């Protein structure tokens, strides 16, 4: 509410004469809210304290991840002053980045399970929000969350972020000025030590806002009388007229409720059924009506009749339902990956294949619950038919919104969509691109390699540190034989990348044929996807044989904790320490089934226990065995040169551009030219650059004087054979033309950096 200080105020005189339509605009424009000024933007903690007791006027629930095609099932609740996240699977922060959902204001995280499907994105997300300046955050959910974070401390270093774990298994959970969250613990009927947490969230009631227009119409003078009306008191004007508070305030908003359900297996159904009466009673109260139910429950449970019956009996016909992980949710929400792939696909379709995931949600039977934009607008006939339809659903995608306050209803206007024609048109509008593309097509076309070609190198993640909307973190899939794959590093979201590139059916086949995973070192961006990949592989029917896990032995405490306290994945792998291969390469029958004759490692110049690796394959090229060397993260390293001598392909990190050599040294990474020189020094036939800083989201800045004839730039979802690499450099004219505006921006940044350095040098000389 805005209080005018005196009757002589020019603002108030203006209010008396303005039309109603302009009145509120003038009031809003004139108000100087002390809580939103620049001073408080620089002091978020002060702002938070000031708003601690304010009940928000806007509350929206946003689907961040729909659970489709390897995407997480995650929901973001945001209000005027706070943010809450419900579940945080792998890829959550990448979706947040893509859809401009700010995580820097996140205050509370609620997890329904402590298994990887619900919390796999937590390590990366906590590191990211720590860098964004968040200093403390609440973490609510099942037992062992605190000990899980403790077990991650080797690779999730939280020096400036305090995470406050809260075990919600006893029922009490969380309350602030915005909402109250009660937990519904479900105990596994076969194993009482295991539990999941469901949540009942109840918004605090909000008093109706004072309507200044109505106050003016009633002749209320500015001053304390406005405050009395705001507080719900009737007043008497000097002329004896009584003005009732109810006549000049908007309707108050009730303590609306919304529910999160997660029933991961049939063993939790008996516990769920015991909560039916409580949920039904909550929904029958007008002041606490259940407007929305979000189902994290997997489809094989939510499709059961017992679950459907529970939903019908426990919630009113007016409650709306959002089903995450439904088979109708067919688009992951990673639109930027499709965009760049459609653009690159024009250059070489077999090197940059279109992504295999389903591109749109196919609506089946639409229920009333998701057809209606506003609950209040449902007519009586539709309501009468709702009973039969309320457990049916249509697909949702990232950015499906539900407005809880000020109005209740589903909003699809911001949903993530794919527009392939627009992606291609963007490149056609670039001056000179079509001419260069036509010239390239006339002069050369890549060999028509079949889908069964091998050796083949598939890049699933080519960015460093944190996921970007176009470059995921490190992961490289090598097809070593017709029925064998090896994975080099396994950053967050690796499984999702496989499914989105190849589709579900082929993705499952690749998962079965995956024979080994190599982890170069224990920085989070190189192995956070490991647990998720092992879980998915373990669920294959029939069960796949254990794969070989090559990793630093220091990963053992983390894996032992997860196997002991959370869930078993240890039967899905056999651990071999990278250090054990320093003196004695892995060879013989153990690796022959991988299409490999030997695997060797070396220490590289990065963090402690960082390794490079070299694979010698049984497959040959030009009558010679194919040798693939991968640097992991490293500065220029002689031991790596010796290990990879005469490699067919060197895959080397190129985190920084050449101008940032000192920064690369401080962070123990390599520049582009350093990586290329490493290839020359080891006499590698081809060098592929990867692990780019996320400042080079589309294309890295390359040195103008380098010979790029034997050098390729890696992109996510790029797959190349040895034959492809021989001709990759011919793509560069069209590629750089396509991203000319972006590369020009990189050049301008470099010039600004150089000018800044020059000023520093001159100041130092004076």
Curated annotation (Swiss-Prot):
Location within or outside the cell: Nucleus; Mitochondrion
Organelle targeting sequence: 1-25
Entry keyword set: Developmental protein, Endonuclease, Hydrolase, Metal-binding, Mitochondrion, Nuclease, Nucleus, Transit peptide, tRNA processing, Zinc
Enzyme class label: hydrolase
Cited InterPro entries: Metallo-B-lactamas (IPR001279), RibonucZ/Hydroxyglut_hydro (IPR036866), RNZ2-like (IPR047151), tRNase_Z_dom (IPR027794)
Main location per the UniProt record: nucleus
GO cellular component: cytosol; mitochondrial nucleoid; mitochondrion; nucleus
Induction record: By juvenile hormone (JH).
GO biological process terms on file: germ cell proliferation; mitochondrial polycistronic RNA processing; mitochondrial tRNA 3'-end processing; positive regulation of cell growth; positive regulation of translation; regulation of cell growth; tRNA 3'-end processing; tRNA splicing, via endonucleolytic cleavage and ligation
Cofactor requirements of the protein: Zn(2+)
Keyword Cytoplasm: no
Molecular function terms, GO-annotated: 3'-tRNA processing endoribonuclease activity; metal ion binding; RNA endonuclease activity, producing 5'-phosphomonoesters
Catalysed transformations (reactions): Endonucleolytic cleavage of RNA, removing extra 3' nucleotides from tRNA precursor, generating 3' termini of tRNAs. A 3'-hydroxy group is left at the tRNA terminus and a 5'-phosphoryl group is left at the trailer molecule
Other information: The dual subcellular location may be due to some alternative splicing and/or initiation that changes the initiator methionine.
Description of how the protein assembles with itself and partners: Homodimer.
Matches recorded under PANTHER family: ZINC PHOSPHODIESTERASE ELAC PROTEIN 2
Family designation: Belongs to the RNase Z family.
Protein role: Zinc phosphodiesterase, which displays some tRNA 3'-processing endonuclease activity of nuclear and mitochondrial pre-tRNA. Probably involved in tRNA maturation, by removing a 3'-trailer from precursor tRNA. May participate in tRNA processing in the developing embryo.
Protein name per the record: Ribonuclease Z, mitochondrial
Species per Swiss-Prot/TrEMBL record: Drosophila melanogaster
Gene coding for it: RNaseZ
């Amino acid at each position: 509410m805005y209080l005018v200080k005196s009757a002589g105020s020019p603002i108030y005189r203006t209010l008396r004469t303005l039309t109603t339509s302009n009145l509120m605009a003038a009031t809003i424009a004139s108000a100087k809210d002390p809580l939103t000024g620049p001073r408080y933007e620089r002091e978020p903690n002060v702002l938070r304290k000031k708003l601690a007791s304010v009940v928000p006027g806007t509350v929206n629930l946003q689907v961040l991840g729909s659970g489709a095609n390897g995407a997480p099932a995650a929901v973001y609740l945001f209000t005027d002053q706070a943010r809450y996240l419900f579940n945080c699977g792998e890829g959550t922060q990448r979706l947040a980045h893509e859809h401009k959902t700010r995580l820097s204001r996140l205050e509370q995280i609620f997890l329904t399970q402590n298994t990887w499907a619900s919390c796999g994105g937590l390590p990366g997300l906590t590191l990211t929000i720590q860098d964004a300046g968040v200093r403390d955050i609440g973490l609510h959910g099942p037992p062992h969350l605190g000990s899980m974070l403790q077990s991650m401390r080797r690779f999730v270093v939280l020096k400036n972020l305090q995470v406050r774990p809260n075990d919600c298994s006893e029922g009490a959970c969380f309350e602030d000025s915005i909402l109250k969250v009660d937990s519904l613990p479900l105990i596994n009927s076969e194993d009482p030590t295991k539990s999941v947490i469901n949540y009942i969230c109840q918004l605090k009631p909000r008093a109706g806002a004072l309507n200044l227009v109505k106050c003016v119409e009633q002749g209320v003078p500015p001053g304390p009388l406005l405050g009395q009306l705001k507080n719900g008191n009737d007043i008497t004007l000097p002329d004896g007229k009584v003005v009732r508070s109810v006549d000049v305030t908007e309707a108050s908003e009730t303590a609306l409720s919304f529910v999160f359900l997660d029933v991961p297996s049939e063993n939790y159904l008996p516990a769920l059924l015991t909560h039916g009466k409580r949920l039904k009673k909550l929904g029958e109260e007008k002041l606490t009506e259940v407007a929305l139910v979000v189902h994290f429950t997997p489809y094989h449970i939510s499709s059961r009749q017992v679950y459907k019956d529970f939903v019908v009996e426990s919630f009113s016909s007016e409650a709306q339902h959002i089903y995450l992980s439904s088979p109708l949710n067919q688009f992951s929400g990673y639109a930027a990956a499709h965009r760049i792939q459609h653009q690159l696909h024009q250059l070489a379709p077999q090197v940059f294949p279109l992504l295999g995931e389903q591109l749109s949600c196919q609506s089946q039977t639409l229920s009333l619950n998701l057809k209606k934009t506003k609950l209040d607008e449902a007519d009586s006939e539709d309501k009468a038919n709702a009973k039969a339809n309320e457990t049916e659903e249509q697909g949702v995608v990232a950015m499906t919104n539900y407005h809880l306050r000020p109005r209740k209803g589903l909003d699809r206007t911001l949903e993530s969509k794919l527009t392939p024609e627009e992606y291609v048109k963007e490149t056609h509008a670039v001056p000179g691109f079509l001419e260069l593309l036509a010239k390239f097509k006339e002069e050369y076309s890549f060999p028509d390699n079949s889908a069964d070609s091998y050796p083949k190198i598939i890049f699933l993640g080519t960015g460093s540190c944190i996921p970007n909307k176009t470059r995921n973190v490190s992961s490289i899939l090598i097809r070593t034989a017709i029925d064998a794959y090896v994975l080099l590093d396994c950053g967050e979201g690796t499984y999702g990348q496989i499914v989105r590139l190849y589709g579900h059916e082929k993705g499952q086949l690749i998962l079965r044929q995956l024979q080994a995973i190599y982890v170069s070192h224990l920085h989070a961006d190189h192995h956070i996807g490991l647990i998720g990949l092992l879980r998915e592989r373990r669920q294959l029917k029939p069960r796949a044989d254990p794969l070989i896990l090559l990793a630093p032995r220091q990963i053992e405490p983390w894996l032992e904790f997860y196997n002991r306290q959370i869930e078993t994945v240890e039967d899905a792998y056999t651990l071999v320490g990278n250090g054990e291969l320093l003196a004695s390469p892995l060879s013989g029958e153990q690796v022959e089934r991988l299409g490999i004759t030997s695997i060797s490692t070396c220490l590289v110049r990065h963090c402690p226990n960082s390794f490079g690796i070299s694979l010698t394959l049984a497959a040959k090229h030009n009558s010679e065995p194919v040798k693939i060397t991968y640097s992991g993260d490293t500065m220029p390293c002689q031991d790596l040169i010796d290990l990879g001598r005469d490699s067919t392909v060197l895959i080397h990190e190129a985190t920084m551009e050449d101008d940032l050599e000192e920064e690369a040294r401080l962070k123990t990474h390599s520049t582009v030219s350093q990586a290329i020189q490493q290839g020359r020094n080891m006499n590698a036939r081809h060098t592929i650059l990867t692990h780019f800083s996320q400042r080079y989201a589309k294309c890295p800045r390359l040195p103008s004087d380098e010979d790029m004839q034997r050098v390729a730039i890696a992109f996510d979802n790029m797959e190349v054979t040895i034959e492809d690499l021989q001709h990759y450099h011919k793509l560069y004219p069209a590629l750089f033309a396509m991203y000319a505006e972006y590369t020009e921006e990189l050049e301008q940044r470099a010039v600004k950096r150089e000018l800044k350095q020059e000023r520093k040098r001159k100041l130092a000389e004076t």
